[in-house]
A protein has these predicted regions:
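PEST-like low-complexity, intrinsically disordered acidic/proline/serine-rich tracts
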Residues: 2-6, 10, 20-265
Length: 265
């Protein structure tokens, strides 16, 4: 029942991710002309706490490092396939690139745990024990990314709020757009994404009648360098962008938290 509900939310979230939101929470005016609420104050849902990944699909591509050349669901173009088929983990290790599969386009797919906190009133922080990575989601308007691209890039976030009117319970989601990325891998077996990639994410939380809480993350990767661009008028799974869904269950505390370094294999 839970898995079916997650799939239904997944389908709905993909549609929302690709379309304009019905109602987007802007940093609006505060009560009685006061300052606008911070992102933390405006939050329609609470994402903070510890979450463990649920590997309910693609087990052999997520729990294990797939063999070279195995990327059946990823719409690579010819250059992307060439690079993926030439993957050599020893070269990544020698170059100090063990973390290429731990960038923003793939880190949430790796098995492990998340710890979500507020870095400050307008910045949401996500730490992963797998690869010991940190992501920062900036809700307040920011300057264009400066400096060198990074594994986690620069992530702009906004609340998308639903309900709260006419007796409908208030809820919502987080939409995140990440740019300014270093090249990385969409899978641990060297399936590439480029510095031109843009990662769109949609975070949805749901609560079951028994109290269990789940986090569903929709990820869309748009990469004109390595993902296949469809000919005009053609639609199909063989072309980008690349969309996938990842689920987590909330856990009580940090008892299972196990920070581990990046691995190229």
């Amino acid at each position: 029942m839970v898995e079916r509900r997650i799939k239904l939310v997944t389908a709905a979230a993909i549609l929302v991710l690709l379309a304009a939101p019905i109602y987007v929470c802007a940093q609006g005016r505060g009560a009685r002309g006061g300052p606008p609420p911070t992102a933390k104050q405006a939050a329609p849902i609470d994402l903070t706490g510890y979450w463990v990944s649920l590997i309910t699909e693609d087990w052999r591509w997520r729990m294990l490092t797939p063999p070279k050349g195995s990327y059946p669901s990823i719409p690579l173009n010819a250059e992307g396939k060439r690079i993926a088929n030439a993957w050599d983990p020893a070269k990544d290790e020698a170059a100090g690139d063990q973390c290429k599969a731990y960038g923003a386009a793939n880190i949430m797919r790796l098995p492990g745990r998340l710890h979500i906190t507020w870095e400050n009133d307008n910045t949401l922080r996500i730490d992963t024990d797998t690869g010991t990575q940190t992501r920062l989601f900036y809700f307040a308007p920011t300057q264009p990314p400066a400096g060198e691209p990074s594994l986690q890039g620069s992530s702009a976030a906004q609340w998308e709020i639903a309900g709260g009117r006419n007796g409908v319970p208030r809820g919502g989601d987080v939409k995140v757009v990440t740019t300014h990325l270093k090249p990385g891998y969409l899978q641990k077996n060297g399936v590439p994404y480029s510095a031109n990639a843009v990662v769109y994410e949609f975070y949805h939380a749901t609560k079951e009648p028994n109290g269990d809480e789940y986090l569903i993350i929709e990820t869309l990767v748009d990469d004109p360098t390595y993902l296949a661009v469809p000919p005009q008028g053609v639609v199909g799974d063989d072309y980008g962008p690349f969309i996938r869904s990842t689920s987590f269950r909330k856990v009580r505390d940090a008892s299972g938290w196990n920070p581990t370094p990046c691995s190229a294999r």
